Amino acid sequence: VNMTKVKEVGADQYIDTDKHTWSTDGFLKTVDALYNGGYENVAAIYCAGQGGDQGTRAIINNMYGGTFTDAAHTKYTADSAENIKAIQTLHDTKGINFDASIAGGDEITLFRNGTLQMAFCWNIAQQANSDNNAAGLTNDGDEIFPMAFPTDSGDPKLCGGIWGFGIFDNGDEAKIEAARTFIDFIAADPDQVKDSVLASTYFPVRTSVGDIYADNEIMSEYSKFMAYLGDYYQITPGWATARTEWWNMLQRVGSGEDVETAVKTFVDNANAAAQA
Protein backbone atom coordinates (compact mmCIF):
# COMPACT_ATOMS: atom_id res chain seq x y z
CA VAL A 1 0.00 0.00 0.00
CA ASN A 2 0.96 3.63 -0.39
CA MET A 3 1.30 4.21 3.34
CA THR A 4 1.73 7.95 2.92
CA LYS A 5 -1.72 8.19 1.35
CA VAL A 6 -3.19 5.65 3.80
CA LYS A 7 -2.06 7.80 6.73
CA GLU A 8 -3.27 10.93 4.98
CA VAL A 9 -6.85 9.60 5.02
CA GLY A 10 -6.53 8.15 8.54
CA ALA A 11 -6.77 4.53 7.45
CA ASP A 12 -3.55 3.32 9.07
CA GLN A 13 -5.72 2.45 12.07
CA TYR A 14 -6.82 -0.65 10.13
CA ILE A 15 -3.28 -1.97 9.64
CA ASP A 16 -1.15 -4.07 12.01
CA THR A 17 2.22 -2.59 11.12
CA ASP A 18 4.16 -5.13 13.18
CA LYS A 19 2.69 -8.19 11.46
CA HIS A 20 1.91 -6.48 8.13
CA THR A 21 -1.65 -7.83 8.31
CA TRP A 22 -5.20 -6.50 8.20
CA SER A 23 -8.69 -7.90 8.34
CA THR A 24 -10.94 -8.05 5.31
CA ASP A 25 -13.15 -5.45 6.95
CA GLY A 26 -10.11 -3.27 7.60
CA PHE A 27 -8.99 -3.62 3.99
CA LEU A 28 -12.41 -2.57 2.70
CA LYS A 29 -12.50 0.37 5.12
CA THR A 30 -9.06 1.42 3.88
CA VAL A 31 -10.23 1.31 0.26
CA ASP A 32 -13.30 3.32 1.21
CA ALA A 33 -11.25 5.92 3.08
CA LEU A 34 -8.89 6.37 0.13
CA TYR A 35 -11.77 6.57 -2.35
CA ASN A 36 -13.62 9.14 -0.27
CA GLY A 37 -10.34 10.95 0.27
CA GLY A 38 -10.18 11.76 -3.42
CA TYR A 39 -8.30 8.75 -4.80
CA GLU A 40 -10.74 7.39 -7.35
CA ASN A 41 -8.47 4.54 -8.48
CA VAL A 42 -7.44 2.76 -5.31
CA ALA A 43 -6.71 -0.71 -6.69
CA ALA A 44 -7.20 -2.80 -9.81
CA ILE A 45 -8.20 -6.39 -10.50
CA TYR A 46 -5.94 -6.55 -13.54
CA CYS A 47 -6.91 -9.19 -16.09
CA ALA A 48 -5.36 -8.48 -19.49
CA GLY A 49 -3.48 -11.78 -19.31
CA GLN A 50 -1.80 -14.18 -16.93
CA GLY A 51 1.00 -11.84 -15.86
CA GLY A 52 0.89 -11.45 -12.08
CA ASP A 53 -2.25 -13.58 -11.81
CA GLN A 54 -1.08 -14.98 -8.47
CA GLY A 55 -2.02 -11.62 -6.97
CA THR A 56 -5.65 -11.67 -8.10
CA ARG A 57 -6.03 -15.28 -6.99
CA ALA A 58 -4.55 -14.47 -3.58
CA ILE A 59 -6.72 -11.45 -2.83
CA ILE A 60 -9.85 -13.40 -3.77
CA ASN A 61 -8.92 -16.59 -1.90
CA ASN A 62 -7.80 -14.79 1.25
CA MET A 63 -10.69 -12.39 1.80
CA TYR A 64 -13.17 -14.97 3.09
CA GLY A 65 -11.09 -18.14 3.39
CA GLY A 66 -11.57 -19.61 -0.07
CA THR A 67 -9.13 -21.88 -1.89
CA PHE A 68 -8.09 -22.17 -5.52
CA THR A 69 -7.92 -25.97 -5.52
CA ASP A 70 -8.75 -28.83 -3.20
CA ALA A 71 -6.09 -29.98 -0.73
CA ALA A 72 -5.19 -32.99 -2.88
CA HIS A 73 -4.62 -30.80 -5.95
CA THR A 74 -7.08 -32.73 -8.10
CA LYS A 75 -9.67 -30.06 -8.94
CA TYR A 76 -10.29 -26.31 -8.98
CA THR A 77 -12.57 -24.86 -6.31
CA ALA A 78 -12.97 -21.22 -7.27
CA ASP A 79 -16.75 -21.68 -7.29
CA SER A 80 -16.96 -21.92 -3.51
CA ALA A 81 -19.27 -19.55 -1.65
CA GLU A 82 -16.23 -17.86 -0.09
CA ASN A 83 -14.62 -17.09 -3.44
CA ILE A 84 -17.87 -15.94 -5.03
CA LYS A 85 -18.44 -13.58 -2.10
CA ALA A 86 -14.93 -12.16 -2.48
CA ILE A 87 -15.25 -11.57 -6.23
CA GLN A 88 -18.66 -9.96 -5.81
CA THR A 89 -17.39 -7.75 -2.98
CA LEU A 90 -14.39 -6.58 -5.00
CA HIS A 91 -16.62 -5.89 -8.01
CA ASP A 92 -19.05 -3.86 -5.93
CA THR A 93 -16.44 -1.84 -4.01
CA LYS A 94 -15.94 1.73 -5.17
CA GLY A 95 -12.28 2.39 -5.88
CA ILE A 96 -11.53 -1.14 -7.09
CA ASN A 97 -11.74 -1.58 -10.84
CA PHE A 98 -11.72 -4.77 -12.91
CA ASP A 99 -9.31 -3.63 -15.62
CA ALA A 100 -8.92 -5.77 -18.73
CA SER A 101 -6.38 -3.35 -20.20
CA ILE A 102 -3.57 -4.14 -17.74
CA ALA A 103 -1.67 -7.14 -16.38
CA GLY A 104 0.45 -7.40 -13.25
CA GLY A 105 3.45 -5.48 -14.54
CA ASP A 106 1.24 -2.61 -15.63
CA GLU A 107 -0.40 -2.51 -12.21
CA ILE A 108 3.01 -2.17 -10.56
CA THR A 109 3.83 0.78 -12.83
CA LEU A 110 0.51 2.46 -12.01
CA PHE A 111 1.11 1.95 -8.30
CA ARG A 112 4.61 3.36 -8.47
CA ASN A 113 3.54 6.44 -10.41
CA GLY A 114 0.69 7.21 -8.00
CA THR A 115 -2.27 6.27 -10.19
CA LEU A 116 -3.14 3.38 -7.85
CA GLN A 117 -2.77 3.38 -4.07
CA MET A 118 -2.50 -0.40 -3.67
CA ALA A 119 -0.86 -3.19 -5.64
CA PHE A 120 -1.80 -6.87 -5.53
CA CYS A 121 1.14 -7.93 -7.73
CA TRP A 122 3.95 -7.32 -5.27
CA ASN A 123 6.99 -9.14 -3.90
CA ILE A 124 10.40 -8.41 -2.44
CA ALA A 125 11.88 -7.69 -5.87
CA GLN A 126 9.42 -4.81 -6.22
CA GLN A 127 9.98 -3.60 -2.66
CA ALA A 128 13.75 -3.47 -3.23
CA ASN A 129 13.47 -1.84 -6.68
CA SER A 130 15.35 1.45 -6.87
CA ASP A 131 15.01 2.27 -10.57
CA ASN A 132 12.92 5.44 -10.11
CA ASN A 133 13.50 6.25 -6.44
CA ALA A 134 15.04 4.73 -3.34
CA ALA A 135 13.87 1.24 -2.42
CA GLY A 136 10.54 1.31 -0.61
CA LEU A 137 9.40 4.57 -2.15
CA THR A 138 7.07 5.45 -5.02
CA ASN A 139 8.28 7.63 -7.87
CA ASP A 140 7.07 10.67 -5.92
CA GLY A 141 8.68 9.59 -2.65
CA ASP A 142 5.66 8.12 -0.85
CA GLU A 143 6.29 5.23 1.54
CA ILE A 144 5.50 1.76 0.18
CA PHE A 145 4.44 -0.52 3.03
CA PRO A 146 4.19 -4.24 2.16
CA MET A 147 1.07 -6.04 3.36
CA ALA A 148 -0.16 -9.60 3.50
CA PHE A 149 -3.54 -10.14 1.86
CA PRO A 150 -6.58 -9.34 4.04
CA THR A 151 -8.40 -12.17 5.79
CA ASP A 152 -11.33 -12.78 8.08
CA SER A 153 -9.32 -15.37 10.02
CA GLY A 154 -6.11 -13.43 10.61
CA ASP A 155 -4.17 -16.21 8.88
CA PRO A 156 -3.13 -15.00 5.39
CA LYS A 157 -2.00 -17.47 2.75
CA LEU A 158 0.43 -15.99 0.27
CA CYS A 159 1.28 -17.38 -3.16
CA GLY A 160 4.99 -18.08 -3.18
CA GLY A 161 7.24 -19.31 -5.94
CA ILE A 162 9.45 -22.32 -5.29
CA TRP A 163 12.62 -21.92 -7.31
CA GLY A 164 15.24 -24.61 -7.68
CA PHE A 165 17.41 -26.58 -10.05
CA GLY A 166 16.60 -29.25 -12.60
CA ILE A 167 18.66 -31.62 -14.71
CA PHE A 168 17.71 -32.61 -18.24
CA ASP A 169 18.26 -36.26 -19.02
CA ASN A 170 20.02 -36.05 -22.38
CA GLY A 171 21.40 -39.57 -22.12
CA ASP A 172 24.91 -38.42 -21.23
CA GLU A 173 25.59 -39.80 -17.75
CA ALA A 174 28.81 -37.82 -17.39
CA LYS A 175 27.00 -34.52 -17.99
CA ILE A 176 24.19 -35.53 -15.65
CA GLU A 177 26.67 -36.32 -12.89
CA ALA A 178 28.52 -33.06 -13.50
CA ALA A 179 25.23 -31.17 -13.20
CA ARG A 180 24.49 -32.93 -9.90
CA THR A 181 27.91 -31.95 -8.58
CA PHE A 182 27.42 -28.33 -9.63
CA ILE A 183 23.95 -28.11 -8.07
CA ASP A 184 25.22 -29.67 -4.85
CA PHE A 185 27.97 -27.04 -4.70
CA ILE A 186 25.63 -24.11 -5.38
CA ALA A 187 22.85 -25.24 -3.04
CA ALA A 188 24.53 -27.28 -0.31
CA ASP A 189 28.20 -26.39 0.03
CA PRO A 190 28.49 -24.73 3.48
CA ASP A 191 30.94 -22.12 2.19
CA GLN A 192 28.90 -21.28 -0.92
CA VAL A 193 25.18 -21.59 -0.16
CA LYS A 194 24.88 -18.22 1.61
CA ASP A 195 26.34 -16.39 -1.39
CA SER A 196 24.09 -18.38 -3.72
CA VAL A 197 20.96 -17.27 -1.87
CA LEU A 198 22.15 -13.67 -1.68
CA ALA A 199 22.72 -13.68 -5.44
CA SER A 200 19.12 -14.81 -5.95
CA THR A 201 17.84 -11.81 -3.92
CA TYR A 202 15.28 -14.12 -2.32
CA PHE A 203 15.16 -16.34 0.75
CA PRO A 204 16.64 -19.73 1.69
CA VAL A 205 14.36 -22.74 2.06
CA ARG A 206 16.54 -24.20 4.82
CA THR A 207 16.80 -22.62 8.26
CA SER A 208 20.36 -23.94 8.51
CA VAL A 209 21.49 -21.17 6.16
CA GLY A 210 20.78 -18.72 8.98
CA ASP A 211 19.72 -15.08 9.00
CA ILE A 212 21.59 -13.90 5.94
CA TYR A 213 19.78 -10.56 5.79
CA ALA A 214 20.43 -9.41 9.36
CA ASP A 215 22.06 -6.20 8.10
CA ASN A 216 19.45 -5.48 5.42
CA GLU A 217 16.45 -3.64 6.88
CA ILE A 218 14.10 -4.22 3.94
CA MET A 219 14.90 -7.92 3.58
CA SER A 220 14.76 -8.53 7.33
CA GLU A 221 11.33 -6.95 7.57
CA TYR A 222 10.12 -8.80 4.49
CA SER A 223 11.22 -12.13 5.97
CA LYS A 224 8.14 -11.91 8.21
CA PHE A 225 6.08 -12.89 5.19
CA MET A 226 7.75 -16.29 4.97
CA ALA A 227 5.49 -17.49 7.79
CA TYR A 228 2.45 -16.66 5.65
CA LEU A 229 3.34 -18.78 2.62
CA GLY A 230 0.38 -20.92 1.58
CA ASP A 231 -0.26 -24.01 -0.49
CA TYR A 232 1.73 -24.51 -3.70
CA TYR A 233 -1.29 -25.45 -5.80
CA GLN A 234 0.39 -24.88 -9.16
CA ILE A 235 1.00 -28.64 -9.38
CA THR A 236 -2.71 -29.27 -10.03
CA PRO A 237 -3.37 -30.90 -13.44
CA GLY A 238 -4.72 -28.57 -16.11
CA TRP A 239 -2.75 -25.66 -14.71
CA ALA A 240 -2.04 -23.93 -18.04
CA THR A 241 -5.73 -23.97 -18.95
CA ALA A 242 -6.76 -22.81 -15.48
CA ARG A 243 -4.50 -19.76 -15.70
CA THR A 244 -6.05 -18.68 -19.00
CA GLU A 245 -9.57 -19.38 -17.80
CA TRP A 246 -8.92 -17.31 -14.66
CA TRP A 247 -8.18 -13.99 -16.31
CA ASN A 248 -10.91 -14.60 -18.86
CA MET A 249 -13.32 -15.12 -15.98
CA LEU A 250 -12.25 -11.85 -14.35
CA GLN A 251 -12.76 -10.05 -17.66
CA ARG A 252 -16.31 -11.39 -17.92
CA VAL A 253 -17.10 -10.27 -14.37
CA GLY A 254 -15.70 -6.84 -15.15
CA SER A 255 -17.90 -6.69 -18.24
CA GLY A 256 -21.01 -7.31 -16.16
CA GLU A 257 -21.51 -11.07 -16.29
CA ASP A 258 -23.07 -12.61 -13.19
CA VAL A 259 -20.29 -13.73 -10.83
CA GLU A 260 -21.70 -17.21 -10.22
CA THR A 261 -22.11 -17.77 -13.95
CA ALA A 262 -18.58 -16.57 -14.73
CA VAL A 263 -17.04 -18.67 -11.98
CA LYS A 264 -18.96 -21.78 -13.04
CA THR A 265 -17.55 -21.44 -16.56
CA PHE A 266 -14.05 -21.15 -15.10
CA VAL A 267 -14.43 -24.24 -12.92
CA ASP A 268 -16.07 -26.31 -15.66
CA ASN A 269 -13.31 -25.55 -18.16
CA ALA A 270 -10.41 -25.78 -15.70
CA ASN A 271 -11.61 -29.07 -14.25
CA ALA A 272 -12.20 -30.51 -17.72
CA ALA A 273 -8.53 -29.83 -18.42
CA ALA A 274 -7.54 -31.31 -15.06
CA GLN A 275 -9.34 -34.55 -15.89
CA ALA A 276 -8.11 -34.79 -19.48
Where are these regions (language model features)?
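Glycine-centered hinge/linker elements that transmit conformational signals in sensory
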Residues: 28-35, 72-102
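Bilobed periplasmic-binding protein-like "clamshell/Venus-flytrap" ligand-binding domains
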Residues: 36-50, 188-199, 273-276
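Short helix-initiation/N-cap motifs at beta->coil->alpha
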Residues: 20-26, 99-113
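Periplasmic solute-binding protein
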Residues: 1-16, 28, 47-72, 154, ...
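Extracytoplasmic/periplasmic substrate-recognition and gating elements
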Residues: 88, 93-96, 134-201
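Short, solvent-exposed loop/beta-turn-alpha elements that line the ligand-binding surface or hinge
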Residues: 16-20, 43-45, 66-85, 133-138, ...
